[in-house]
Amino acid sequence: MSGCHINPAVTFALAATKRFPWGGVPAYWAAQVAGAIGGALAIWASFGSRVFDFGAGFGVVDFNNDVTSWGSAMFVEALATGILMFAILGIVDTRSPEGWAGLVIGLVVVAIIITVGPLTSASINPARALGPLLVSDLNGSFHNWTEQLFAYIPANLGGAAIAAFVYDWVAKPRIVQRPIKEAVTEPDRADAYESAAHV
């Protein structure tokens, strides 16, 4: 139906590499952020204000300035988001085995959370960072969210876009010649690259 982007960084990277129309980006971003805010509000409604006592358990992204600097947090988030984007493009490439996307992407996310979580809370998703932070601010539980947030959003967007360009350079999955609407919902095709090479 929609390509199941879920992540604004994924949408941005797909648009940057001509896999998705730029005109569709605002609507996707709005839906993704609204979903993140709605999810955070649902948790608040379900568990009450007690949920904010758990800090990161509510999903609020944060990094300890005594352990991780602002620049280090940006680098880690960019790298982690890039790894996720690279895995996504690799598994949806039609040269990859079919039916493994959910498992592979899920395992990559788990691995990223385990390794990056202690450093930056492993956002890897601007909407996932923004939703809980905004809701926590509404509750008055988190007051430096703007400082923290800007360590995540640029890193997530940039890391995903760089990874997408690197994937195209390394794997050469295709040269975009199909209608852009078709490229949104269908995976890359190796034969599209081959046929384009003979044009």
Regions found by a protein language model. Give the residues of each.
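Membrane-interface helix-loop junctions and terminal tails of multi-pass membrane proteins
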Residues: M1-V199
